Regions:
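Acidic, Mg2+-coordinating catalytic module of metal-dependent nucleases/exonucleases
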Residues: 158-164, 170-223, 232, 241, ...
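Conserved DEDDh/DEDDy metal-dependent 3′-5′ exonuclease domain
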Residues: 78-80, 89, 93-104, 108-190, ...
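Short, amphipathic alpha-helical segments that act as regulatory/interfacial helices
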Residues: 58, 62, 144, 380, ...
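A residue-level signal for conserved active-site and pocket-lining positions in enzyme catalytic cores
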Residues: 14, 113, 143, 231, ...
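Metal-dependent nuclease catalytic cores that hydrolyze phosphodiester bonds in DNA/RNA
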Residues: 1-117
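C-terminal extensions
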Residues: 211-327, 333-334
Length: 484
């Protein structure tokens, strides 16, 4: 039974995720016992809207061939397809065949475009990505293998039609050995598959909807993967020195190891100690910079900002549907700007920037606090996209009006947690969330249901979630200042 190309790419990104997906598929097909069923993190499933966007991107290229270039395009996307049907169409010598579904002994897949030029073929794959990724090249290798096997013709060139609406030629030479090795690993993996023995999930793999399952394994095994921002290569270096768990790292008498800087090793030892001492409700921490990277105490007029963006409406930037602002004046207040279309988004952006500029006239020393770099990146993209307030925004940034509390936390504290996300770090300040909505990924799902499925009651829940993020930024700032 041939494997799908998408399965092969999932394996490339994460053998663990592939094993989980294969196991669940076998359970659903009643080929193995239901006890092997693995829970998924639904918030990490591929968005239906992203799939729709990808299909629209394919149609853009199809129409370019069909209308702009006046080529004869055979559309097999909605037809029962087989190798036989594909070959029948190929023998009619059209210019392009769109989405044929074909198979070889090892693989089966639906190619986006096959371009026919005399006795040679070209493959074009449409991707919304802004750049060529190795997984795209691996996918094209499989497509080429299938197509050459079925057609008995040579595929001489492959291209990617990316989000910039340009063709990008793919060079295969330096990837031949990588693909051959990957295919061998994939086949061997399937030949030795056992529902009782999953591969160990490695740090840095694209675990997708099985990330929670991986975390369960890391917690069960007290795995080094639990350490904040540790990389797979660093884990291997520790294991090469017989340090396989957080507990063993905490207790080791070693002061350094080969291939890892002494300061880095000491940092991970300290993180292991803090992680070991932490509980679900109480996270241990240590101050490593008494000045907290120059953190200012909360000042009258300071604002706390957080945005909610949706990534699948436009290419190259998020649709910013919610700008939130919390003010720490005597009458703690929350202001927000909601958008349902791009015109409203522009108006919201303009209103937001004007709010900041007017606020500075009242409070010249005010700072605008946020968490991570998303807000600054978003504002710059919006200013550029809408062609307004670009100069004023850059002046605010240059004057250091914006303060990233993540930078303060990351540079000043060591925390006994696997993540330094706001949802984690705010626990240090004793903040307990009560909102129904608990994560950024959930907010994206809620917005999809609101926007596309007309579940309008979800709007209030999203706004409450954003309000909590903004207010909790203030509470976190206040707690951090208490450490000074």
């Amino acid at each position: 039974m041939p494997h799908s190309v998408s399965e092969f790419i999932r394996f490339y990104n994460s053998p663990f995720s592939y094993w989980c997906n294969k196991t669940n598929k076998l359970v659903d097909e009643k080929k193995i016992d239901a006890k092997y069923k693995i829970q998924i993190n639904a918030s990490k499933l591929v968005s239906k809207q992203l799939l729709t966007k990808a299909q629209e991107h394919e149609v853009v290229l199809k129409d370019k061939y069909r209308i702009s270039e006046n080529l004869n395009v055979v559309d097999m996307s909605n037809k029962d397809s087989s190798n036989k049907v594909f070959l029948e169409q190929l023998n009619k010598n059209p210019d392009v065949i769109f989405q044929p579904y074909i198979s070889s002994k090892d693989f089966v897949g639906r190619l986006d475009f096959v371009k026919i030029l005399d006795d040679e073929l070209h493959i074009i794959d449409a991707k919304l990505s802004s750049s060529i990724k190795t997984e795209h090249i691996m996918q094209l290798f499989v497509y080429r293998e299938i197509l050459e096997t079925v057609s008995k013709k040579q595929v001489t060139e492959c291209f990617l039609f990316l989000g910039d609406l340009q063709m990008h030629k793919v060079e295969f030479d330096k990837y031949k050995e990588i693909y051959a090795e990957l295919k061998n690993q994939f086949m061997d993996f399937n030949n030795s598959y056992d529902p009782e023995t999953p591969p160990y999930p490695k740090k840095g793999e694209e675990l997708q909807e099985y990330d929670d399952e991986a975390k369960k394994i890391w917690i069960r095994d007290n795995g080094l993967e639990l350490l904040y921002r540790i990389q797979a290569k660093q884990i291997e270096k520790l294991k090469n020195n017989d340090i396989k768990t957080v507990e063993e790292l905490k207790n080791t008498n070693l002061e350094k190891i080969d291939g890892m800087g002494e300061a880095t090793f000491i940092k991970y030892k300290k993180l292991a100690q803090l992680l070991n001492d932490s509980t679900e409700n109480k996270i241990s921490y240590e101050i490593k910079d008494a000045s907290l990277n120059g953190l200012l105490k909360p000042n009258k007029g300071d604002l706390y900002i957080d945005f909610e963006g949706y990534p699948f409406l436009t290419i190259g930037r998020n649709f910013e549907y919610l700008y939130g602002i919390w003010s720490n004046n005597k009458n703690d207040s929350f202001t927000y700007y909601w958008s349902d279309d791009e015109e409203e988004e522009k108006n919201s952006f303009v209103s937001f920037i004007e709010k900041l500029l007017e606020h500075l006239e009242l409070y010249p020393d005010a700072k605008f606090y946020h968490y991570f770099s998303y807000e600054i990146s978003s504002l710059r993209k919006s200013a550029q996209n809408f062609g307004v307030y670009e100069k004023e925004l850059e002046q605010l940034i240059e004057k250091k009006c914006f303060i990233d509390l993540f930078t303060i936390v990351n540079s000043s504290l060591l925390i006994g947690a696997s993540s330094y996300s706001l949802k984690t770090v705010e626990k240090l300040a004793g903040i307990n969330r009560t909102e129904d909505l608990q994560s950024g990924m959930e907010s994206i799902q809620y917005f999809e249901d609101y926007f596309f499925n007309e579940e309008y009651e979800l709007k209030d829940l999203i706004i409450e979630y954003n309000k909590a993020d903004c207010k909790n930024l203030y509470l976190l700032h206040d707690w951090l200042a208490s450490l000074l």
